[in-house]
């Protein structure tokens, strides 16, 4: 189940990413609560807006990032991305410490961090197959999900303690420091494949990637499901602070516990994917997981019992990670090596772009209907219906 960790370079990067991801999830918890504190009754809209401005650069720049990842040393791209994100975290810590923080500053720095991720993400995703090889790629993707979701468990717990004991500054400051570990891991990578210099223009290479995806029925389906899953599913996590305050009348400690349950489920889901990756019919499993996640999200929206809500979040976290880990694996496995950076970047535009658009749309709907649970209920029903449609009609994906 951990065979990919036998590769030195992947092991170093995995450990560095785990430490950095813990810091990132600390910041996610603190930043969501910061926005609720700054914006009061408008918090649902601003949480959606923050998600939008943080992820919008994915729509704008990730395709370019994918082309660059097929032309340049991916380590250098990742290094620059991590340094920029570290600077953003430390700037937020400083602004909160001095009392100068305003909502527009949070939104601006979220956009800058998103720009860095638009170039670092394709570099990271296209580097992984070169570190472990095709045979161990599904296991590497699953392990990457495990480290990310271990951080989803550990990060909110540490954030809850840090917020209660030291305040928000500690969460942002510790996240800034955590980037040093992944930076050190990148610098320690040895004998890494560097793409050959391209003789064609960036625009032509981008067109090649788009053309390949457009003519691949399975890649089109994977890309569409990545977008739909993020658009309809991720508002569940975005609105947890609102549900904490408006439905359960609880504080940040309760919100942190909910995030921890979702993260624990996500780790369970990632471990499951590490086993599933050895089997065929990944596409069929993906559709079943998406349909199940939509159902659980609807049940969570109806729950008014803290214990039941926590249990449903655990299940939802597992199903969400299993779904997205399988879409990521399929995107990487279906892409030829020379086009992987571009193909993965197109998938990332869909997946990462679906999150801000979904957060913004769902946030606006909450302001219209006055109920975050009602919007989540609708999202769950629609997601389940779409997944079942793909499962019944096929479209080739269920046989992959």
List the predicted regions and their residue ranges:
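Helix-loop boundary and gating motifs at the non-cytosolic
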Residues: 1-56, 211, 215-262
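Substrate-agnostic recognition of the 12-TM MFS/MFS-like secondary transporter fold
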Residues: 9-29, 51-88, 105-164, 174, ...
